[in-house]
């Protein structure tokens, strides 16, 4: 497996590590998303202390408004995080 393929598989594995905890095994509840954000993107969101911001992130990702974030919706967050990481590498 190539390095990129390993990283892609890692993203899928992280999603599933949190999605299986509550409710449907292939979606993230608000609580699961919060846990994922605070543990897996801790440095990216370190300045976000307000619970309302996490709620806004959840609502923004929940495109079909079913109170769950599926993998397709989660990928939107991954894309935003990747853009931020890319931007940050050019600022250093």
UniProtKB/Swiss-Prot annotation:
GO terms for cellular component: cytoplasm; cytoskeleton; cytosol; extracellular region; nucleus; plasma membrane; secretory granule lumen. It comes from the Eukaryota. This is Protein S100-A12. Coiled coil: none annotated. S100A12 is a calcium-, zinc- and copper-binding protein which plays a prominent role in the regulation of inflammatory processes and immune response. Its pro-inflammatory activity involves recruitment of leukocytes, promotion of cytokine and chemokine production, and regulation of leukocyte adhesion and migration. Acts as an alarmin or a danger associated molecular pattern (DAMP) molecule and stimulates innate immune cells via binding to receptor for advanced glycation endproducts (AGER). InterPro entries: EF-hand-dom_pair, EF_hand_dom, S100/CaBP7/8-like_CS, S100_Ca-bd_sub. Residues 38-53 are annotated as: Hinge domain. Ca(2+) 2 binds at residues 62, 64, 66, 68, 73. It is found in: Secreted; Cytoplasm; Cytoplasm, Cytoskeleton; Cell membrane. PANTHER family: PROTEIN S100-A12, S100 CALCIUM-BINDING PROTEIN. Signal peptide: none annotated. Residues 13-48, 49-84 form the EF-hand domain. Ca(2+) 1 binds at residues 19, 22, 24, 27, 32. Cu cation binds at residues 16, 26, 86, 90. The hinge domain contributes significantly to its chemotactic properties. It holds the Pfam family S_100. Zn(2+) binds at residues 16, 26, 86, 90. Predominantly expressed by neutrophils, monocytes and activated macrophages. Expressed by eosinophils and macrophages in asthmatic airways in regions where mast cells accumulate. Found in high concentrations in the serum of patients suffering from various inflammatory disorders, such as rheumatoid arthritis, psoriatic arthritis, Crohn's disease, ulcerative colitis, and Kawasaki disease. It is a peripheral membrane protein. GO terms for biological process: antimicrobial humoral immune response mediated by antimicrobial peptide; defense response to bacterium; defense response to fungus; endothelial cell migration; inflammatory response; innate immune response; killing of cells of another organism; mast cell activation. One of its GO terms (molecular function) is zinc ion binding. Keywords: Antibiotic, Antimicrobial, Calcium, Cell membrane, Copper, Cytoplasm, Cytoskeleton, Fungicide, Immunity, Inflammatory response, Innate immunity, Membrane, Metal-binding, Repeat, Secreted, Zinc. The lineage of its organism: Eukaryota, Metazoa, Chordata, Craniata, Vertebrata. Homodimer. Homooligomer (tetramer or hexamer) in the presence of calcium, zinc and copper ions. Interacts with AGER and both calcium and zinc are essential for the interaction. Interacts with CACYBP in a calcium-dependent manner.
